Design a protein with these regions (language model features):
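Acidic (Asp/Glu-rich) sequence patches and key acidic residues
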Residues: 1-135
């Protein structure tokens, strides 16, 4: 049984994209190769790739359906935590009431890179019912 991870993309520039990619390379599992393309990046997210565009349209909605809690799900969440940190995404969340995977991902990311939004993201994921972060 899987669930859906979702987010809303905000408009950002190349410098922000490059900073986020650098951080994502640090925080995701190194076994998941990041493919750089002219239009953006992709990395393996289980049964599909998780992609981030270099030049997104304002308000693009994204989602990734998962099949259970495979390890790649945490990497998608880590990438979204970085995207919220860098101002690239907002309203990140999922349709499951248990936020432990988000909280664990947040802790792992914060151990590897400095997060100015750490307190806000942690407070969000501890709320009940869950609300979207980065609004």
């Amino acid at each position: 049984m899987g669930y859906e991870i979702f987010w809303t993309i905000k408009k950002y520039d190349d410098a922000t994209f490059d900073r986020a990619v650098e951080m994502i390379r640090i925080v995701i599992d190194h076994r998941h190769k990041i493919d750089e393309k002219k239009w953006g990046i992709c990395f393996d997210a289980g049964h599909e790739n998780f992609c981030i565009q270099r030049n997104p349209l304002e308000g693009t909605y994204g989602s990734c359906k998962t099949r259970g809690r495979f390890p790649y799900t945490g990497d998608v969440m880590k990438a979204l935590i970085v995207m919220v940190e860098c101002g690239m995404a907002k309203e990140a969340g999922h349709n499951e009431p248990d936020n432990s995977l988000w909280l664990n991902s947040l802790e792992m990311v914060s151990e590897l890179v400095e997060l100015k939004t750490y307190s806000a993201q942690k407070a969000y994921f501890k709320r009940e019912p869950p609300l979207a972060i980065g609004s």
